[in-house]
Amino acid sequence: MDYGVEDIYHYLNTTENDTYPSTMLKNMECGAAMLARHIANNDKILLVVDDDCDGFTSSALLMNYLHMLFPYFVENNIQYYIHEGKKHGILSADIVMPDIALVIAPDSSSNEYALHEQLAQQGIDILILDHHKAPHYSQYACVINNQLDDYPTKSLSGVGVVYKFCKYLDEQLDVEYADLFLDLVALGITADVMSMCDYETRYLVSNGLEHFRNPLIKALYAKTEFSINKSGGLSPYNLAYYIAPFLNATARVGTVKEKTILFESLLEFKAYDQIASTKRGCAGQMESVVEQAARNCTNIKSRQTKERDIDYELIESMIERQNLLQNKILLIQMEQGEPAIAGLIANLLVAKYHHPTLILYKMGDMWQGSARNDSRYGLEDFRQFMRDCDLVNFAEGHESAFGTQIANENIDKFIEYSNKALQDYEFSPVDRVDFIINANQLTSEFILDIGKLHYIWGQEISEPLIAIEHIAITNDNLSVIGKKEDTIKIMLPNGISLMKFGSTEDEIEALTPDTSTGCVTINALGVCNINNYNDQEYPQIIINEYEIVGRQSYYF
């Protein structure tokens, strides 16, 4: 396994010494002085909440922190703005009311140079706490951005930059409040799929996972705790997989009211306020903001999943009918559908077909939507590839996940250009395994040692993939279990069980030997797991995929 971590022992035992001084971020002093001046002047401040999990947690952390210092000021002088639909940045000066003296944009706006100038000319200060790449610093805003200077930890997301800002305020005010919100830091960083390789990021996220304080995080964890524990317990990966999607779904397809309830449920001083219940059959009753937000998140995520599945099925038929996989970039043009979930569907298509993928929706003479890519399959920076071709109006966001727009007249030209530029790329499915082991040599100790590291798995510190060869399946060691009778269990002679969940009847039939003395031989790819039962640890391999390599009527 090679994760780019130089010292594994150090990585597993990070301390506060692995964090860097906040002053290593350029403009930290300027930003703190700007905020302090407006608080001292009792000015009105506008906080622009960015439309994803990192954006919501970034703004919530700042609000919670400032409320501990200046509760009256925060409740009376700071307004927050949430865009309708899924949008990023300040976007327009129209959202800034005449009485606003300072605009704060956590997790966005580094490259909105013209808007910064426009607001500055109106006498409005702008404080940006961001992590997105931009060509340069803005002349008209105070920008604190770990991507624009020499700050070593590039894997901090927006909420990480906000945290560093609050740590600086801690030092100036001789308080220790910032670390109280590390659960928000952990959620935002993992939701934004930031690398977990850096020692500082590892330290912040692992500490955030140790204790949940935030009302909404606690409520969503209570809903997902069983699934999380079944998947090995809390880890950066499980936080991103089980909890972050609730916030991202609401940010994508929720109404402004639903998103406002969500944001307020992240605020410790608002989360337990009583509001009119929207629960079916509870008209006239009251409930807390966080209770309503947690239920909304669940319903919205379910609604989003249904919309995603409908559009995904339509897109799959388009891919086959139009032979779109003949192109190097999988470009889908949608006349209808829900643009807010384009990124979700694009992720599924990248996982299945391994091509860089664009899902674009018609908007007048333009096609606009989401781009996704997996750099493991060859193209390291999809966003830069699109920017370099001069056929794209914009490509804004992260290297492998961003929004883009192409003029209708340039679609065919872009396809032709990309096919030529990427002609040497295969984008074929490749499973990069960490270990190849014969089934007879697989040991319980090996599985338990890896399984006990579940708490570190995250982006770029991925769970090891194990290739197990020559697994002999007989009627004696094969069983089908579970309420739905769709879980295949293969028990090896040394007590290790191989589990395949969600199996079809055809799979079960294919893996069942033809005779009572027969054998089916498979090779499998899977991950290590520990099944805790009656205070005992049992080693398991969870099978992701397999191939049948042999079948015989007699096995000895």
What are these regions (language model features)?
Residues 137-191, 397-398:
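Short alpha-helices
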Residues 124-139, 356:
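Short, acidic/small-residue loops that bind anionic groups at enzyme active sites
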Residues 102-108:
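Short acidic, glycine-rich surface-loop motifs adjacent to enzyme active sites
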